A protein has these predicted regions:
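Predominantly flavin-linked oxidoreductase catalytic cores and closely associated redox partners
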Residues: 1-123, 139-143, 159
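A broadly tuned preference for mixed-charge, low-complexity surface segments
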Residues: 73-90, 136-155, 204-219
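Noncatalytic linker/hinge segments flanking ATPase motor cores
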Residues: 68-77, 94-101, 127-141, 174-177, ...
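C-terminal helical "tail/cap" subdomain of flavin- and related membrane-associated enzymes
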Residues: 181-222
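Short, function-defining helix-loop hinge/capping sites that tune catalysis or transport
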Residues: 41-42, 164, 214
Length: 222
């Protein structure tokens, strides 16, 4: 989309479609459009408290204990956070994550290289062959306005990722379970006013509180 405007009875969304410009009207606009959410930015709904950066490769040949998750810490491989090796059947996912302000000008790939070349543990990585790689931001900390009149944010766009592991699927489903029953009832009556949405967004206060507690514990131990 390149435009979205809230009216009393609907949201008007304009977008580039396969046949040119298209205009769509909807009762509720759901922004489930990721860490760089256009919906969140367009409506100035706030930013996640922090955005971590994760880099992960999938490898064969990792010399770890069968069925066991390995975690590695250290400022040279994941400053302020940790790295991991997670078995997934025939392959292992090896990754590292941190925050941009802790990276001292290095890239996520460089930190992962440090992990793979660490003299204390590199015997586990000697036979590894990379088969895939993934990199991206991990937004954590529920945004200031997850719901406004006729607009709701979900998942990464709302900043629901766990501050301890970066996981977003579980919290995303939990957010859906919390909000959708109320939103569905309100949509039946087309009652999605600012006051109503503010009331529904209060359901996320406990999630935000848990994020703050877990972030404090993470920062205390890593």
């Amino acid at each position: 989309p390149y435009s979205a405007v809230v009216f009393d009875e609907f949201v008007e969304v304009k977008m580039d479609g396969p046949n040119g410009d298209e205009t769509v009207h909807c009762k509720l606009l759901c922004g489930a459009d990721g860490a760089h959410s256009w919906v969140r930015r367009n409506f100035r709904m706030g930013n996640p408290r922090e955005t971590m950066i994760g880099f992960q490769i999938e490898v064969t040949g990792y010399n770890g204990d069968s069925g066991m998750l390995d975690m590695y810490t250290g400022k040279n491989i994941a400053p302020g956070f940790f790295s991991w090796a997670i078995p997934t059947g025939d392959t292992t996912r090896v990754g590292t994550w941190t925050k941009s302000e802790l990276m001292n000008g290095l890239s996520s790939e460089q930190y992962l290289d440090e992990l793979l070349q660490d003299q204390k543990i590199n015997s586990r990585f000697e036979q590894c062959s990379e088969v895939a790689r993934f990199c991206g931001p991990v937004p954590s900390g529920v945004v200031r306005k997850p719901l406004i009149e006729r607009v709701a944010l979900f998942g990464d766009s709302a900043g629901v990722c766990k501050p301890t592991t970066g996981g977003g699927i579980g919290p995303g489903f939990k957010q859906v379970d919390l909000l959708v029953p109320r939103l569905s009832k309100c949509m039946e009556n087309n009652e999605l006013s600012r006051g109503t949405m503010k009331s529904i967004s209060a359901l996320l206060k406990e999630m935000a509180r848990n994020q703050r507690k877990k972030r404090a514990l993470r920062d205390a131990f890593l």
